[in-house]
Design a protein with these regions (language model features):
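Short, extreme N-terminal segment that most often corresponds to the first beta-strand
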Residues: 1-21
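Short, flexible N-terminal segments of the mature chain
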Residues: 14-41
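Acidic, low-complexity intrinsically disordered segments
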Residues: 34-87
Length: 87
């Protein structure tokens, strides 16, 4: 089971936050689906994700996206995904 804490940050403060849960084990191949589900729940655009985002999540249990990672305009400074199985 995976649990991902997703949050949008504005001026170093959490604006929106959810815990995303999925019964399957984490796989990098499914990262896009997790990202789409999380963004739909937060009602934000889906960012363009690169290999570096997946690699950072796998190696450090977190990753983040900034304005340049989005095609659409956003109303936050940073979008953070963090492993939440310990929460």
């Amino acid at each position: 089971m995976i649990r991902i804490w997703a949050k949008t940050i504005v001026e170093e403060k959490v604006q929106k936050s959810i815990i995303y849960e999925n019964s399957e084990n984490f796989t990098p191949e499914n990262f896009q689906q997790y990202l789409e589900d999380i963004c739909a729940k937060l009602d934000i655009p889906v960012p363009v994700y690169l290999t570096k985002h997946i690699r950072h999540y796998v190696n450090f249990n977190n990753t983040f996206f900034v304005e340049s990672d989005f095609v659409e305009s956003i109303d936050f400074d940073k979008f953070v995904l963090e492993e939440a199985s310990n929460y």
